[in-house]
């Protein structure tokens, strides 16, 4: 797809683009461009709340050399070409105004490498006054890097409206969070003043479970997570409802609703969710949610508002009923019964006498919640009133529910942390110990082997590090193994006399750089070869991944990473390296052989 300037007959039908009024709007536009380019990894670096610099890197399809200049012009886009395309918009952006608006209020450096090029890209520079430089050849990985410098340097009035760095960063943080949640295949990192603030990893598992949200949002009062998965004809809605306690503060509530991957603000859509939940909970619980609705593109009109959050849904009444029905179905499938449990016990006892059911019921059973599941669904006049329950199915099983929700993982149910370094895990009525430090070390090692292209985080050096070549052998070593070094995040600018190190993997401390490079060169002098496994071993020997105290967030991070790389762990046959069964045979034999027992 090539970037073309839209003709007047088409651009006149497009609504005005969003005005760049703060750094958050810059980040929003650049992230949407990255997502539209099919990027799976986006790195965002902010300095001084975005006023000094904003850098957005992605691994998308890139921009061709011939399209670089055109991308900074108004109404230049590759997403639509005619008026007919406005009725079938599948991308987040379509106006071709983002980069042009940003370049008008800042200095911008745009460099990119498309799929056809092999680590050879092109870069252009705009000075903020409409002057665009000639494309220059640069070494570049596949994707695009957009650097925005000195935002509003030529608009002093807008600079005065900026409150503070912290308030602007909070806006950016919310924008990054909302766009990251739009796609679970997207990996996003956010840095502010050279510090890693957020990292949203791409997950194929349920990345919005209750434990993750406890860590991210501090939602300690989540009572129940209700998954939503419902479809009708061409409409489909998925996501999660989070029922919160009535004392839950409104500041920690979150409501994200996405239509075709775009976060939207629509009163009818949000009202449908609240209407369905209120009929079940009778306003006794607050609700937060993350919901994804898929519709045909021709049923939406995105071209009505500059921010593109406010859209027009053609059959809004049908969508309202569909959303309400989907929420009611999900809540009925996993319904939280808030009534007095004695009513349930009384009804069951009565049904036992009527139907002559031959089973023993425990009278002092502690039921804190009950799940009613049905295969079919129809909307009754009075929804799920426990007083009207007259017949309980014989197949219904009651279990003693525990107040604490354990983290359910691929390895089993995580019960507790033992002696600060071990997780006690239960699976299939067996207990296992999960060694946290080894697991973290193993994940770091796998990330190094998979490399930067597969999500390895790198960090820029605060101070420049130069290695001066002692002889031509060292110079040729860096040239020969440049790709394998950059694969693990060791990026060098190589000259005839020295190599300048620009970035390193996240697990390396700056103080160990000299030792690591010396060991790499020493091994090369002896073996005359450098393999990826040897390089990874050298880096891991000098990495700092020791955790003194494993808190809830760190445990969740390691577990989710291990689930992500679970297939690789099985293929390498290193599962026993981090997970071992607990043997109770000696203890049981002791009690059996003890004469006192």
UniProtKB/Swiss-Prot annotation:
GO BP, one annotated term: mismatch repair
What InterPro entries does the record point to?
A: DNA_mismatch_repair_CS, DNA_mismatch_S5_2-like, HATPase_C_sf, MutL/Mlh/PMS, MutL/Mlh/Pms-like, MutL_C, MutL_C_dimsub, MutL_C_regsub
Q: Which residues form a coiled coil?
A: none
Task: List the Pfam families.
Answer: DNA_mis_repair (PF01119), HATPase_c_3 (PF13589), MutL_C (PF08676)
Q: Which PROSITE patterns match?
A: DNA_MISMATCH_REPAIR_1 (PS00058)
Please list the GO terms describing molecular function. Answer: ATP binding; ATP hydrolysis activity; ATP-dependent DNA damage sensor activity; mismatched DNA binding
Domain of life of the organism in this record?
A: Bacteria
Q: Keywords assigned by UniProt?
A: DNA damage, DNA repair
Q: Which GO cellular component terms are attached? A: mismatch repair complex
Classification via PANTHER family: DNA MISMATCH REPAIR PROTEIN MLH, PMS, MUTL, DNA MISMATCH REPAIR PROTEIN MLH1
Family of the protein in this entry: Belongs to the DNA mismatch repair MutL/HexB family.
Functional summary from the UniProt entry: This protein is involved in the repair of mismatches in DNA. It is required for dam-dependent methyl-directed DNA mismatch repair. May act as a 'molecular matchmaker', a protein that promotes the formation of a stable complex between two or more DNA-binding proteins in an ATP-dependent manner without itself being part of a final effector complex.
What is this protein's record name?
A: DNA mismatch repair protein MutL
Q: What is the lineage of its organism?
A: Bacteria, Pseudomonadati, Pseudomonadota, Gammaproteobacteria, Enterobacterales
Q: Which gene encodes it?
A: mutL
């Amino acid at each position: 797809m090539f970037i073309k300037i839209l003709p007047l007959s088409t651009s006149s039908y497009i609504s005005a683009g969003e005005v760049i009024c703060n750094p958050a709007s810059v980040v929003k536009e650049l992230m949407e461009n990255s997502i539209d380019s099919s990027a799976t990894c986006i790195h965002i670096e902010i300095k001084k709340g975005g006023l000094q610099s904003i850098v957005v890197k992605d691994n998308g399809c890139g921009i061709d050399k011939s399209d670089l200049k055109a991308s900074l012009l108004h109404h230049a886009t590759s997403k639509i070409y005619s008026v007919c395309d406005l009725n079938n918009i599948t991308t987040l952006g379509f106006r071709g105004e983002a980069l042009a608006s940003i370049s008008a209020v800042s200095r911008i450096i745009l460099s990119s490498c498309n799929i056809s090029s092999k680590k050879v890209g092109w870069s252009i520079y705009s000075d903020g006054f409409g002057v665009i430089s000639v494309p220059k050849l640069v070494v570049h990985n596949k994707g695009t890097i957009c650097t925005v410098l000195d935002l509003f340097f030529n608009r002093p009035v807008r600079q005065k409206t900026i409150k503070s760095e912290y308030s602007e960063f909070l806006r950016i943080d919310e924008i990054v969070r909302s766009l990251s949640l739009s796609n679970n295949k997207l990996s996003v990192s956010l840095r502010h003043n050279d510090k890693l603030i957020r990292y949203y990893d791409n997950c194929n598992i349920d990345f919005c479970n209750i434990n993750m949200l406890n860590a991210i949002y501090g939602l300690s009062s989540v009572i129940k997570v209700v998954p939503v998965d419902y479809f009708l004809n061409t409409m489909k809605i998925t996501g999660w409802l989070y029922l919160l306690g009535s004392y839950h503060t409104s500041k920690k509530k979150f409501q994200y609703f996405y239509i075709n991957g775009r976060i939207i603000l629509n009163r009818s859509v949000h009202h449908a969710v609240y209407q369905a939940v209120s009929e079940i909970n009778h306003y006794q619980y607050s609700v937060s949610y993350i919901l994804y609705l898929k519709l045909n593109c021709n049923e939406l009109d995105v071209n009505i508002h500059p921010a593109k959050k406010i859209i027009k849904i053609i059959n809004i009444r049908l969508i309202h009923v569909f959303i309400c029905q989907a929420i009611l179905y999900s809540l009925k499938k996993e319904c939280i019964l808030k009534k007095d449990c004695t009513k349930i016990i009384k009804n069951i006892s009565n049904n036992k006498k009527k139907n002559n059911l031959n089973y023993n019921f425990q009278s002092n059973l502690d039921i804190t919640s009950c799940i009613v599941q049905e295969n079919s669904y129809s909307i009754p006049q009075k929804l799920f009133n426990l007083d009207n329950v007259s017949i309980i199915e014989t197949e219904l099983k009651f279990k003693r529910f525990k107040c604490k929700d354990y983290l359910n993982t691929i390895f089993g149910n995580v019960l507790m942390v033992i002696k600060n370094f071990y997780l006690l895990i239960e699976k299939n009525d067996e207990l296992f110990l999960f060694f946290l430090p080894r697991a973290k070390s193993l994940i770091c090692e796998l990330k190094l082997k998979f490399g930067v292209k597969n999500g390895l985080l790198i960090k820029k050096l605060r101070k420049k590090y130069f290695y001066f070549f002692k002889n031509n052998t060292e110079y040729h070593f860096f040239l020969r193994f440049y790709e394998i070094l950059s694969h693990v995040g060791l990026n060098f600018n190589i000259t005839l006399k020295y190599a300048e190190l620009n970035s390193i993997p996240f697990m390396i401390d700056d103080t160990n750089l000299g030792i690591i490079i010396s060991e790499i060169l020493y091994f090369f002098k002896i073996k005359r070869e450098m393999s990826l496994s040897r390089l990874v071993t050298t880096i891991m020997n000098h990495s700092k991944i020791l955790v003194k105290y494993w808190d809830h967030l760190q445990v969740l991070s390691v577990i989710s990473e291990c689930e992500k790389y679970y297939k690789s762990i099985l293929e390498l046959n290193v599962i026993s390296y981090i997970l071992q069964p607990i043997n109770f045979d000696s203890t049981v034999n002791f009690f059996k052989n003890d004469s006192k027992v």
